[in-house]
């Protein structure tokens, strides 16, 4: 197999849990229009991307959890909290030119 089922279930759990938790925390589902000039964090981007990155880093370090889904769920919750509360502190908004 190209990718193990444990890893795939972890990635899917990370995507689903990050979108659900970020929607519960009040992030909009999509960024404001026009999307390419928007700096508004949303439930669709960058939350699942950060969750996938955290899951991939954890798997590469050898932490797989029980079935991978628990690791993905934890990464999804952490990425949603980070996006909702800390993202603009880490990456400030660009200045308008």
Swiss-Prot record:
Region forming the signal peptide: none
Source organism superkingdom: Archaea
Key words of the record: Cell membrane, Membrane, Transmembrane, Transmembrane helix
Location(s) in or outside the cell: Cell membrane
Gene Ontology annotations for the cellular component aspect, listed alphabetically: plasma membrane
Segments crossing the lipid bilayer: 7-27, 43-63, 71-91
Main localization (coarse): membrane
Membrane topology of the entry: Multi-pass membrane protein
Pfam families: NiFe_hyd_3_EhaA (PF17367)
Family: Belongs to the EhaA family.
Stated role: One of the integral membrane subunits of multisubunit membrane-bound [NiFe]-hydrogenase eha. Eha is predicted to form large electron transfer complex and might catalyze energy-driven reduction of low-potential redox carriers.
Quaternary structure annotation from Swiss-Prot or TrEMBL: Putative multisubunit membrane-bound [NiFe]-hydrogenase eha is composed of at least 20 subunits.
Protein name: Probable [NiFe]-hydrogenase-type-3 Eha complex membrane subunit A
